[in-house]
């Protein structure tokens, strides 16, 4: 993980446009390729971000031409591909970071002055251990996939992927694959996790097209907005009601 504290300005160019004026911020570049811009507030929420898969390219800026317009990338110096470990760090005082995803959306960060630039190898994270209620909720939904939608059937619980297991993999009434992320309280982090799973599973020709479903006892408004914006279905589930539903699994005793 690379952590850069710098004076910077940020422009997002995509379906919408957004601008952050020049200020001191934290730039976070993770090993998975994601880049996020943070201020000293908003808890864990970034001001702007780009999720993987995306590429980060660094362009040195001519210091003697501060008023140059860089919106088309034509007035910058030689560019170099930037690895997430920061190994290709340029010696120029000012830089233009262009972060671009597969859809062509860009996060353009003009770094005016670096205060700190540090890279850490955090290694592989073991991930979160679900609490008792959340783990049981996942188990109950796997037993009763119809609670997620009429006609839903279970493919597999804890479906393995290279980036971790999908909580539940199902098929809807029309036979389409649906990846389900289960949370006790659904927040933005859960939506981001589901996004990564869906993007990865859609590369599998057998499973594609894969849709996403975000299931939780409670879904925060911001998380619901983000999930629906990404085309995911949101389902609020009643844990107590599910606990009282007889299991359809065959039991010996």
UniProtKB/Swiss-Prot annotation:
Residues 63-91 are annotated as: Disordered. Keywords: Cytoplasm, DNA-binding, Endonuclease, Hydrolase, Nuclease. InterPro entries: Endonuclease_NucS (IPR002793), NucS_C (IPR048301), NucS_N (IPR048302), NucS_N_sf (IPR049173), tRNA_endonuc-like_dom_sf (IPR011856). Its EC number is 3.1.-.-. CDD domains: NucS-like. It is an enzyme of class 3 (hydrolase). It is found in: Cytoplasm. GO terms for molecular function: DNA binding; single-stranded DNA endodeoxyribonuclease activity. Coiled coil: none annotated. PANTHER family: ENDONUCLEASE NUCS. Belongs to the NucS endonuclease family. This is Endonuclease NucS. It comes from Corynebacterium kroppenstedtii (strain DSM 44385 / JCM 11950 / CIP 105744 / CCUG 35717).
């Amino acid at each position: 993980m690379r952590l850069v504290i710098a004076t910077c300005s940020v422009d997002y160019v995509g379906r919408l446009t957004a601008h952050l004026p020049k200020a001191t911020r934290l730039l976070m570049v993770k090993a998975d390729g994601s880049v996020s811009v943070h201020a000293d507030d908003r808890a864990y929420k970034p001001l702007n971000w780009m999720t993987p898969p995306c590429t980060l390219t660094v362009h040195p800026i001519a210091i003697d031409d501060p008023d140059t317009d860089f919106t088309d990338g034509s007035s910058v110096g030689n560019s170099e591909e930037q690895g997430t470990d920061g190994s290709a760090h340029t010696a120029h005082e000012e830089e233009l970071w262009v972060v671009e995803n597969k859809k062509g959306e860009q996060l353009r960060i003009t770094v005016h002055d670096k205060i700190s630039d540090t890279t850490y190898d955090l290694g592989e994270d073991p991930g979160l251990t679900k609490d008792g209620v959340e783990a049981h909720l996942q188990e109950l939904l796997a037993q009763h996939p119809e609670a997620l939608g009429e006609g839903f059937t279970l493919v597999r619980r804890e479906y393995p992927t290279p980036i971790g297991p999908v909580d539940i993999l199902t098929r809807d009434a029309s036979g389409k694959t649906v990846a389900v992320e289960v949370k006790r309280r659904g927040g933005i982090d859960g939506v981001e996790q589901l996004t990564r799973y869906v993007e990865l599973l859609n590369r599998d020709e057998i499973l594609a097209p894969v849709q996403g479903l975000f299931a939780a006892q409670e879904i925060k408004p911001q998380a619901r907005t983000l999930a629906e914006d990404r085309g995911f279905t949101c389902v609020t589930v009643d844990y107590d009601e599910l606990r009282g539903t007889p299991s359809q699994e065959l039991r010996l005793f």
